[in-house]
């Protein structure tokens, strides 16, 4: 994991979750959040990372499990509607949250979290998106705290996550 020396305020944002509810900074407060930027038509990195995050969450216990949420933010809002995300994200874990919104709002949010993405040009409607596979960690104040860089390792990520939480609780 790469810890930010000083956790960073992510600014204001207003997106929509896969239930059609508002997803804004208030939704990140009071618990730890793991954010992954992906898209439902992604052939490899996204399903692999979502399955990994489900395994990770299953390994947590007690308060760790209770106050950790996982969010997948779509980098393909043109195809990833609320309905599309509702059929995709809960497949990995019914507690996971899928988020979409206007392209510029998502781009601004991704930029604040150092997770760039771009559409691969010249593929018509069957396009791919180049995107970061980092998993961002947001602290209970709603600030960008750290990120995990692939290849993700379950045992290492668990130990690191616990350490970060212990330091936070001091």
Language model features with spans:
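Extracytoplasmic/secreted envelope proteins and their assembly/folding machinery
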Residues: 50-57, 82, 86, 103, ...
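Thiol-/selenol-based redox modules, centered on thioredoxin-like
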Residues: 123-170
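Thiol-based oxidoreductase modules, predominantly thioredoxin-like and allied folds used
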Residues: 65-80, 95-104
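N-terminal "domain-start" segment that seeds a small globular fold
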Residues: 1-26, 51
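Short active-site neighborhood of thiol/selenol oxidoreductases, capturing the structured segment around
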Residues: 23-49, 53
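Short, internal strand/loop/helix patches
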Residues: 86-132
């Amino acid at each position: 994991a790469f810890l930010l020396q000083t956790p960073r305020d992510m600014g204001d944002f207003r997106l929509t979750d896969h239930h059609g509810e508002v997803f804004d900074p208030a939704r990140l407060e009071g618990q730890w959040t793991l954010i992954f930027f992906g898209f439902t038509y992604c052939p490899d990195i996204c399903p692999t990372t979502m399955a990994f995050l489900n395994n990770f969450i299953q390994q947590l216990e007690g308060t760790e499990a209770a106050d950790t949420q996982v969010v997948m933010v779509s980098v393909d809002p043109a195809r990833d509607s609320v309905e599309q995300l509702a059929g995709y994200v809960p497949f990995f874990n019914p507690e996971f949250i899928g988020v979409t919104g206007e392209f510029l709002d998502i781009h601004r949010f991704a930029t604040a979290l150092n997770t760039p993405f771009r559409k691969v040009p010249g593929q018509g409607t069957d396009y791919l998106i180049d995107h970061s596979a980092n998993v961002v960690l947001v602290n209970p104040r709603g600030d960008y705290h750290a990120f995990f860089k692939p290849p993700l390792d379950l045992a290492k990520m668990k130990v690191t996550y616990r350490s970060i939480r212990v330091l936070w609780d001091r």
